[in-house]
Amino acid sequence: MSVLDENVPIFKYFEEISKIPHGSFHEEKIADYVESFAKEHNFKYVRDDMNNVIIYKNATPGYENHDTVMLQAHMDMVCEKNKDVDFDFETDALNLYVEDGWLKAKGTTLGADDGFGVSYMLAILSDDTLKHPNLECVFTVQEEVGLLGSINLKKEYFNAKKMIGLDGGGEVSTCTTTSGGRYAYVDKTCA
């Protein structure tokens, strides 16, 4: 039984991916799902050795000469559970429920970071009524453990000069734009 309104594409896709284990370093099954989605919709796509998936959608008529836009979200989630919960993030589906208007997962993290970003892209890709330029939808892996998927992407996969990063943030937002990530390491000798 569905917890969310399946008539709303983003909710439908979020609920579907919540059934697929997708912790960091274990994104194969969700990458399979995204690849199957691309095949089902006859989109050109690339899946690399790390399981990053890039789906390409052609511009709608009248938008062919606009700059290509990249949308990006990561497929892995933070895997945390309550101490009293028996749950295996490599095999078990999340158990979603709504309480007082809030979507939650029983005894575990929800996976909204970045499951909603992934769901947004799938909803955008599946909607043939949206007007848009060429799209490069980038589904990365291993973001939660150091942006490893995005660091290893090959530049020849992309033509976009504009990017919108889709990642959750804050108590009431479901989608924010981000400017990418960067790590800085500092060594300091202490006396």
Question: Residue ranges of each PLM-predicted region?
Answer:
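Active-site metal-coordination/substrate-binding segment of hydrolases
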Residues: Y63-N134, F139, E144, I151-K161
